[in-house]
Amino acid sequence: MIDYMNVYPRGEHASNLGCVIAKNIADHYQLPSFIVDPVAVDEMEDIARFTGMPEIRRMSLFHALNQKAVALKASKDLKKDYHELNLIIAHLGGGISVGAHQKGRVIDVNNALDGDGPMSPERSGSVPIGPLYKMVFSGQYTLAEIKRKNYGQGGLVAYLGTNDGAEIKKRIDSGDQEAKFIYEVMCYQIAKEIGSCSTVLKGKVDAIII
């Protein structure tokens, strides 16, 4: 597991450090270390993995810790077992993932790390592939620069120069129409992704949780 995380096979993220840190502490104090609640889970239906390119499959890479925790809390509030419910859960952070939870399994979800789904405060989300590959092969950008446009310097940061929601709210309240419009663009894309998950669940949705 340590070797797997050190090469970032599914993308660079701070959560990859968890097991490495745990192992270092455990080795130092000669104690066992465990993964109890995984950072990511893969419960996707096979049909959700396929794309129009046989070489590329969709991956289950999302904010599983938060989505699962929120699902359990919501189930308690609804006085039902998580494994009896169909839920749509939207994690709204620096990255945004929206999952279709069917009877305790996340059967489809956007990959918030690799530019799948809505734009977020600092990620581009899905973009048309034609203009993207023209950018990639234009000679004007390095691979690292393209990656930053997708992850870290995309979304609200790319348009408004900040990922700070409080600052953007102040700008909107002061009459900044560009900030208002771009924020609405992000909200539109989130709502669209939620609607997509409703289709995955065949319209049988017990709750939408944001």
Kindly label every feature range from the protein language model:
Residues 205-210:
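Glycine-rich phosphate-binding loops at beta-strand->alpha-helix junctions
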Residues 91:
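Phosphate/pyrophosphate-binding catalytic cores of soluble transferases and nucleic-acid-acting enzymes
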Residues 1-18, 40-49:
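Short beta-strand-loop/turn "lid" adjacent to the catalytic site in phosphate-handling enzymes
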Residues 148, 152-203:
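Adenine-nucleotide phosphate-binding core of ATP-dependent small-molecule kinases
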Residues 2-5, 49-54, 170-178:
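Gly-rich Lys/Arg/Thr-decorated short loops/hinges at beta-loop-alpha junctions or inter-strand turns
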Residues 19-25, 35, 42, 50, ...:
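Glycine-rich phosphate-binding loop plus the immediately following alpha-helix
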